[in-house]
Amino acid sequence: MEEKFYADMITHSFDSIDTFIQTANEVLNRRKSRAGKSLEHHLSDIFVHNALVFEEQAVTEDNKKPDFLFPNGKCYRNIQFPAGDLIVLGAKTTCKDRWRQVLTEADRVDVKFLFTLQQGISKNQLKEMHDSRLTLVVPQKYISSFPRDYQDEIKDLLGFILMVKEKQEHLPKHYFL
């Protein structure tokens, strides 16, 4: 795909190293953005297939938009809806420091979840996540790549789906209309 957008530019010489670096960064950022959106689309398909009620990019406080809000933004904005039945899931191909963004996306939700494909996150970062009440969700086969002390705190995707289903099964159906 990058060839389509950048072939002409690449075949001509760059005016400077800065121009080359700027172009390389644009290409990398486009790739990262596509990978992130692809991950969100795959998760969305999985959630639909599992009959979960959710909304993508629902607006919360200060126009913030978590990747996934269970059950939806309408329930989130309804002060009568039990906050303990709201679930927020961020989706990041890699965490780095961007995991902190998930913490600020929905004030009504105490414990937030982050799905990632990144393996082997450091103990220090896992401790920070735990202390910030953020639970990692990863593919089941990735759990063994994390420090043993934290493996029990990490959910696999199936466990996350079952948790959401359990919460949603006990909610009155009028919330989903």
Residue spans for each PLM region:
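Interdomain/boundary linker segments immediately adjacent to catalytic/signaling cores
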Residues: 1-37
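Catalytic core segments in nucleotide and nucleic-acid processing enzymes
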Residues: 41-44, 48, 53-177
